[in-house]
Amino acid sequence: MSVPPRAVQLNEANAFLKEHPEVLYVDLLIADMNGVVRGKRIERTSLHKVYEKGINLPASLFALDINGSTVESTGLGLDIGDADRICYPIPDTLCNEPWQKRPTAQLLMTMHELEGQPFFADPREVLANVVRKFDEMGLTICAAFELEFYLIDQENVNGRPQPPRSPVSGKRPHSTQVYLIDDLDEYVDCLQDILEGAKEQGIPADAIVKESAPAQFEVNLHHVADPIKACDYAVLLKRLIKNIAYDHEMDTTFMAKPYPGQAGNGLHVHISILDKEGKNIFASEDPEQNAALRHAIGGVLETLPAQMAFLCPNVNSYRRFGAQFYVPNSPCWGLDNRTVAIRVPTGSADAVRIEHRVAGADANPYLLMASVLAGVHHGLTNKIEPGAPVEGNSYEQNEQSLPNNLRDALRELDDSEVMAKYIDPKYIDIFVACKESELEEFEHSISDLEYNWYLHTV
């Protein structure tokens, strides 16, 4: 992932500023370990300098916990003097922010060492290292995300979220009503602005569907033949959705499980692989007989326990699991089966792909993709067989065997020899240190339920 030539960069900046003389500011964006977008806001007059020389940001940006505090045990904070690295623009990510009252653009960045090589702890680079292994095989990954979220009221009830009132009916939704078109109409202005904003920003969002809970929706991204770009789109789509919803006097949550007893938010990813001739190596009239497909699935299933910390990176992530919510809890696969971890849609022989259905919407897309592709590559190179596909309800046929809490998931990741071949062990150490720090803080907190149960009872 080399830095593009200076002339190419400046041409992009010049063309954009010429086309958009109204733009006053530019937000320089970079996604941290948690997928939280951070960065700087500059005046338009400084944009050329950013393209020419980059901007400095501390390496500790990739050692932040979910609250934005540096986790010193990572070694990226005070141990190195909280030193800067340099961030360069990612080509073709300069665009307008349609929600801003003062005309503002945005530009996605990636971090490098001062000498120019990519910084190992940038999640985008973590993914790039895995993608290079497919490049060496002459293979191209096609990928697309499905992103679930809740619209919520800007006013909480006793610190808990609640569905927003419909701008159309004035009522709060209370039923599931999956795929109900009328529920799309209840929030039509907000949802249409999301799709139109995505189009303006070049994000290939092609559909919104009503999901399985009150005011829960899913945006589908179209597949692209670049898994890093697919993750860029997912990160930027989350930011777009949050800001468009706020413009409509609502909030949004991508929390994995915001409501007890309701469906959680997932982040499913669809993956196919093209050979040098651009043909899908998974294409088959009979997917069970396609060796490449079987081996890819076999590798993903074998590494799934080690993927879990990246797929479900927060304490709340594990509250999402349950048969009634279509969240798989064992490493299994099936043909057109939504109860399994790896579903193979069977609509078209040319479009055969794997759908990875485990991750929550709170996952960092780059790390999610890196861990899944690590499994795919592991399976292809070692010809790992996945076993027979599950028919019917997998929850009745397979006991839960995936890690069901963050601590166990971190242990699986830390102990995985396979994952360490694909993701720099130094990065795994940093990730585990950050998540263990969050976990320790969580475990030392006292919940409202504990006070309700024990304060006056024991």
Segment roles from a protein language model:
Residues 102-104, 144, 212-214, 264-268, ...:
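Short, solvent-exposed loop/turn segments at the edges of secondary structure
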